[in-house]
Amino acid sequence: MTPSQIIVLATPVFFVLIALELVWGLARGRNTYRLADAVNSIGLGMLSQISAVFTRLLRVGIYTAVYSSVALFPDATFWTSWAGWLLALVFYDFCYYWLHRAGHEVAVFWAAHVVHHQSQDYNLSTALRQTSSGALFGWIFYLPMAVAGVPPLVFGVVALVDLLYQFWVHTEHVGKLGWFDRWFCSPSNHRVHHAVNERYLDRNYGGILVVWDRLFGSFQEEDERCIYGTRKPLNSWDPLWANAEVYATLLRDSWRTRHWGDKLRVWIKPPGWQPADLAAAEPAPPFQLDAVQTFGPPMSRVVQGFGVVQFALLLAGVAAFLWTADRLPLAQAAVWLAVLTASLWALGAVLQGRMGMLEALMIESAALATATSALGMIDLHRIFKPLTMVIAIIFIATYAASARAGGQNGSSTRLGDRWLVLAALLACLAGDVFLMFPGYFIPGLVAFLIGHLFYIAAFRLGVPWLPSRRALGMTLGIGGTMYTVLWFGGLPPALRIPVAAYVVVIALMAAQAIGRAAVLRPGPGGRAAMGVAVGAGFFMLSDSVLALNRFVAPLPMAQFWVLATYYTAQVLIVRNVLIDRNPA
């Protein structure tokens, strides 16, 4: 049985305990759960587990290579005895202590570990909140076990035991436990670890044993109320940003500081350290415990219900993936990783209010359409491909109708604007359907050409025709170059004129979108216009990949890249095209 399968089997136990903690807290008037926070924490755990299918190869592979080369005492008989198992577990916990401590005292390790601390709640769902990048460097701290001769199988088992033990200590409903607190990581000890109080900061690192903290001077007793989270709150339900936030800050500081030594020190100094030049220009504000505010955008009951249903479906999808992941080809596993990641991101965006439910459904349907095409699941593909555009059409219709009912009189709510976009989407829907069947390439090409003409007309509203000559020259140049490649790469003579017409029209569509963004950029609609322009660029990229694969040479995973870029284009256009506050 694989580690992923063990996690799947343990998941029902996790949720039973979470449910019991929730009921207990409600009954005692001390509920420690919030829906969005719990979904976000568990979602980050899902993302951690599905990405571990790939990153685990790094950790286990390096460990096995070192063990095979330099193990000093590789006696399997000893290590699989009760004394060997116990020693290996203590050895692992000792290494974990130093990894965990580095995760708080060295910025690059904190960038990975911070995910576990971002929740401002402390409950059993917080235990499942795990990083997706910890394996990139964490393996370094366990190499002493490989050198000592702990077999990889024993290492894997004790690592899982150490991880599972730490689940139960993430609760506010278990008080101090007397002698147990003096030896082991307990709820009281670990509450201190998660707190941002000054006296609690960077304390109690032990995974199973807290004696390491007592030995190395990092122990702190719980003696005042804990405030949870990080000193620089994430303030987001975005699982991708949760993993990238600190890395982005380190990259920015490393790039902006003038001194070459500081460009390295940024990564190895304690979290929050700033080079002198950056600290002088942009000093970090002092942390004030009494100013901490809990992040929690309001949600309607409909959104809460949507979130619960989506979460349940994603949980089932993640469980199915983890159960079979080790038997899947790497490319196939990567496709499903992309689907689940996109869906987790969309769910977080809905819960935060950054995206509507229809937009999230469009993204999820697009991801499934892409995956089913790439993996040859034709029957399912023929459902999800048209469904994606149907959802987009419904979204545009309802968005425009609600904006109009709300009394907005800007150009984005004009009837013509709505119908032009709807006509473009209907044409794209027809093109999608045609291209699902052999022998209908020309009808599909014509349908998309019509769709681009409607998009051009929609992008024209509120701005001049083709307002940027530079954009026009760029898109026509790219289109002309691609057409030349197709011509010499084997484009059939019967398709040369239709494809030429299509290339010109899509280049004009992209040029109009880019020019529109240039005109609107200084105003409130500039960001949305830029989203439309980027979407138009992805449209050109998608069609280029499709044409190269069809007429020049087969490309690896072509269907995945064609549809991934196509749906990225449609999502960006659909989400942004009606957001334009400039007056008509």
Question: In which residue ranges do the predicted regions lie?
Answer:
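Membrane-embedded catalytic scaffold of the fatty acid hydroxylase/desaturase
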Residues: 46-58, 79-233
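Transmembrane helix interruption/hinge and helix-loop junction motifs
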Residues: 3, 147-157, 325-328, 376-378, ...
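Transmembrane alpha-helical segments that form the membrane-embedded catalytic/substrate-channel core
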Residues: 15-23, 90-105, 160-175, 186-192, ...
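Membrane-interface helix-loop junction between the first two transmembrane segments
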Residues: 19-39, 376-384
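Cytosolic/stromal cytosol-facing helical appendages immediately following the last transmembrane segment
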Residues: 121, 172-310, 347-348
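Polytopic alpha-helical membrane-helix bundles and their juxtamembrane interface segments
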Residues: 357-584
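Short, hydrophobic transmembrane alpha-helix segments
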Residues: 1-5, 27, 68-72, 323-327, ...
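Substrate-recognition/cap regions that form aromatic- and gly/pro-loop-enriched pockets
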Residues: 297-356
